């Protein structure tokens, strides 16, 4: 059987895609990445998507679809879920994708994790990438895992650098700080501050005092629980008072304010050189506006006028 795998977000390495590949290769099937030019040559096509806003225009009725981008409650069949990951299908993937737990004990109304994966529970980690340079720990809330200490022991045993995707700052304590300091890390240590009504200053104090040798980044949700004033307060408080890099996550990516605010904060050159008020005054919304702005600057410069600087 000739099986094709269609990843609708090719910039993201999809672990489910790798498990489907492993399953079919174990059965002796020929597995490859999907190409529309050879559509009629495939016996079976799997299409994967993580996000509902991803364009599905090239998905055809004969494809087997999966992922939250198609159905929030979609699941892999158990015989595929039990398979290891076939990293060879993604040769540019230079890290291992590891879960020690699934689900979450919280039920935040903006998040699909609890609905999709249920209450937090431990899972056995899959195989490491033989060509991986580091381990990406995908747990939604690492320290909420009832067996997080066993997970730490496994990470020490693997002895590779780690990119941990996130943890709940509200649970953070001195024991966890000691554990984090003992682990090898790569890139940035990440956590979230979703609700501006959560006073997390004592946790931030502990974090910067104990994880001083790591770059810290905080995901800041906007457009759900917060006002624009609270959004600005959080990003300024994180950066000005703690030196923690804020990264804005818009709840509605199509909302003009949320898109504009995220662009300002997440572009660190803009965030560190302009106030929010200054950025709004000089906001450029598109490539066309930017090119028009450059033409105006050039004309003014030619007439010895003071050019507008965005």
Model-derived regions, located:
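N-terminal [4Fe-4S]-dependent radical SAM core
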Residues: 1, 53-57, 63-101, 105, ...
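A short, structured N-terminal alpha-helical element that caps or precedes a catalytic domain
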Residues: 1-62, 71
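Core AdoMet radical
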Residues: 6, 46-49, 112-207, 214-225, ...
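Acidic/glycine-enriched edge-of-secondary-structure segments
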Residues: 11-31, 107-112, 163-166, 189-196
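A general structural detector for well-ordered alpha-helical segments in enzyme core domains, enriched
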Residues: 20, 56-59, 151, 175-179, ...
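Short, well-ordered alpha-helix to beta-strand connector turns
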Residues: 28, 41-43, 60-62, 94-96, ...
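A structural preference for short, hydrophobic beta-strand core positions in alpha/beta folds
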Residues: 30-36, 65, 164, 218, ...
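A structural motif corresponding to the C-terminal lobe/cap of the Radical SAM core domain
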Residues: 188-190, 197-310
